[in-house]
Amino acid sequence: ECLGKTSDGKTIYLWQRNGQEEAPLLRELGRLREIAFRAVEEGSGKRRDTDSYDDDYLHLILWDDDDLEIVGAYRFMPTAMQVEKCGVEGLYSYSLFHYDEKMQDILEHGIELGRSFIQPRYWGRRGLDYLWSGIGAYLARYPHYRYLFGPVSISGGLPPAARDLLVAFYRLWFPASHPLAASRQPYPASLPDVLAQFGGVDYVDDLTKLKSLLGNLGCGIPPLYKQYSELC
């Protein structure tokens, strides 16, 4: 299913395996996903990064008609459909989080996002923005979905001090006022000396401080963290 075209001629498709015995497209998605994740030291170590959830989930694919290449993809699933078919255990996020019973409304009217990637040769060329445009096009067709949620990772390739800073900053500025999910493997509590780096009064000041501290460590804020926090 075609969801639209970008201003520079790329095409956004929606694809699902639907029980096909042979799925060369899924194999290619897994190969490119592994390449992209290895580039930020998050690779699985396998030839292809695929799992059982790929068989059921929808895949939003950005296609380059000129290069005949997959630019990137986002995996997502209307959660009510998957829960009806497989139970809550059929959701990827459930393997990472315990759900509160109050999560039910979100599961009934939500879409789980995850496993996004842009292959390295297309980094810095609006690929992630185009994928978000595709998600927007899907929501325009199915406006009864009210929530987007899903896990986002921090690269294990970042220095421990950088990971601590990121966790402390986002816990400070984006806390869960009504927690609906709890991590099965929670990150340790932020140390006082890390929290002391941020004033907690002015978001822009603290964000500037975070960027400076990460820059001193030779890294930056992961792109998805930037996009998700801007949406908030």
Which stretches of residues belong to each language-model region?
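Short amphipathic alpha-helix that is part of the acyltransferase structural core
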Residues: G4-H59, W63-G72
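Short beta->alpha transition motifs characteristic of CBS
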Residues: Y74-A80
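Acyl-donor binding region in acyl/amide transferases
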Residues: P24, E34, S44-R47, A80-C232
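Anionic group-transfer/hydrolysis microenvironments
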Residues: D66, M77, F117
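Short, compositionally biased low-complexity segments
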Residues: E1-K10, A196-V201
